[in-house]
């Protein structure tokens, strides 16, 4: 259904603020989970159980001095973190949070998501170049090479989903996963290879361990944001955690039924009055949120348990393994659609 403009504006306002809050919650969750993995307590001083620690960190960053290197390009140096945050905040507009609840329900939604996530590499590259530092520049170059390499494999995974759904519209892709008994229509069951490739490449696209070569501390000090301080530095971290949550949203939407409630057809058969109700919309939103939180936890767990790839291993995995397997998977899915649809 088409929402009135004022409802769309209200949802957009709520989502932007929710993503800002989510970044803080994810920082807290990461610290607590890493503390658990390493047998530590994690933050436990500011607020109940340390929950307000991320907000204290934001206040600290706001009052820190904003230092710009003497030979840096001041305009681009300030523009780079802005690009990162803006792109990260834009992608959720294309994700349906419940049936009919989406800010921008466009026919080429999947392509728009891929395009927006691709643009974020400009922020990292510009940050590396504008800082006039060899460490920052190397981090920017690494990021460009990494994201270009893994976007191809990610594209093959998305293409296989498009072939299955027969549409580029994100809502249509979610609804296509209603086919099949209970949860067996989800693309993770009908296209497991594509799901695995997309999850792996999503780790690389968000520059998280084991794919965090652009900001490898042991090699590049801080990578592309070595010369950033104050709130500009904080904006990079805000973008990183928003991207983490957005990537989890996209994984859940394309391969795990999105807002579809598990066993939804059986639920509607037992309670027909739920069809089109606000309660069903709330259940769908909570279903999407639960799936997203699971993948956000997976991101954090992998970061604190897996070692970093070497650069040659990173490139080999992308070009020699994921891309050929992804292309073969597209061919198999295309044959399956042609023969059995």
UniProtKB/Swiss-Prot annotation:
Query: According to its record, how does it sit in the membrane?
Result: Multi-pass membrane protein
Tell me a GO biological process for this protein: aerobic respiration
List its EC numbers: 7.1.1.-
Name one matching Pfam family.
NADHdh
Segments traversing the membrane: 9-29, 75-95, 108-128, 154-174, 180-200, 244-264, 278-298, 321-341
Q: Where found in the cell?
A: Cell inner membrane
> Which top EC class is named for this enzyme in its record?
translocase
For whether the record's keyword set contains Acetylation, the answer is: no
Predominantly, its location class is membrane
Q: Which reaction does it catalyse?
A: a quinone + NADH + 5 H(+)(in) = a quinol + NAD(+) + 4 H(+)(out)
Q: What GO cellular-component annotations does this UniProt entry give?
A: plasma membrane
Q: Which UniProt keywords apply?
A: Cell inner membrane, Cell membrane, Membrane, NAD, Quinone, Translocase, Transmembrane, Transmembrane helix
Cross-referenced PROSITE patterns:
COMPLEX1_ND1_2
Q: Name one GO molecular function term.
A: quinone binding
Q: What does this protein do?
A: NDH-1 shuttles electrons from NADH, via FMN and iron-sulfur (Fe-S) centers, to quinones in the respiratory chain. The immediate electron acceptor for the enzyme in this species is believed to be menaquinone. Couples the redox reaction to proton translocation (for every two electrons transferred, four hydrogen ions are translocated across the cytoplasmic membrane), and thus conserves the redox energy in a proton gradient.
> Could you describe the subunit structure of this protein?
NDH-1 is composed of 14 different subunits. Subunits Nqo7-14 constitute the membrane sector of the complex.
Q: Which family does it belong to?
A: Belongs to the complex I subunit 1 family.
Q: What is this protein called?
A: NADH-quinone oxidoreductase subunit 8
**What gene does the UniProt entry assign to this protein?**
nqo8
């Amino acid at each position: 259904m088409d929402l009135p403009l004022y409802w769309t504006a209200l949802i957009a306002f709520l989502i932007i603020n929710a993503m800002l809050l989510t970044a803080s919650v994810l920082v807290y969750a990461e610290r607590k989970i890493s503390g658990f993995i390493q047998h530590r307590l994690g933050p436990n001083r500011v607020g109940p159980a340390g929950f307000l620690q991320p907000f204290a960190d934001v206040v600290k960053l706001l009052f820190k001095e904003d230092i710009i290197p003497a030979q840096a390009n001041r305009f681009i140096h300030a523009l780079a973190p802005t690009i990162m945050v803006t792109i990260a905040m834009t992608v959720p507009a294309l994700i349906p949070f419940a049936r009919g609840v989406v800010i921008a329900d466009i026919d080429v939604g999947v392509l728009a998501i891929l395009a927006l996530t691709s643009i974020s590499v400009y922020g990292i590259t510009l940050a590396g170049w504008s800082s006039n530092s060899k460490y920052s520049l190397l981090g920017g170059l690494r990021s460009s090479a990494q994201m270009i390499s893994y976007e191809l494999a990610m594209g093959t995974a998305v293409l296989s989903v498009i072939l299955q759904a027969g549409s580029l519209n994100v809502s249509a892709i979610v609804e296509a996963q209603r086919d099949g008994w209970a949860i067996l229509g989800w693309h993770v069951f009908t296209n497991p290879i594509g799901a695995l490739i997309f999850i792996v490449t999503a780790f690389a696209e968000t520059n998280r361990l084991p794919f965090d070569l652009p900001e490898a501390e042991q090699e590049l000090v801080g990578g592309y944001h070595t010369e950033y301080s104050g709130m500009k530095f904080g904006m990079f971290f805000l973008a990183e955690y928003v991207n983490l949550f957005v990537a989890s949203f996209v994984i859940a939407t394309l391969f795990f039924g999105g807002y579809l409630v598990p066993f939804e057809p059986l639920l509607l058969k037992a309670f027909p009055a739920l069809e089109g109700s606000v309660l069903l919309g709330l259940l769908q939103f909570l279903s999407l949120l639960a799936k997203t939180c699971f993948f956000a936890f997976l991101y954090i767990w992998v970061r604190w348990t897996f070692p970093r790839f070497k650069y040659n291993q990173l490139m080999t995995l992308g070009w020699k393994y994921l891309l050929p397997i992804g292309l073969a998977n597209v061919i198999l899915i295309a044959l399956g659609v042609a023969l059995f649809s």
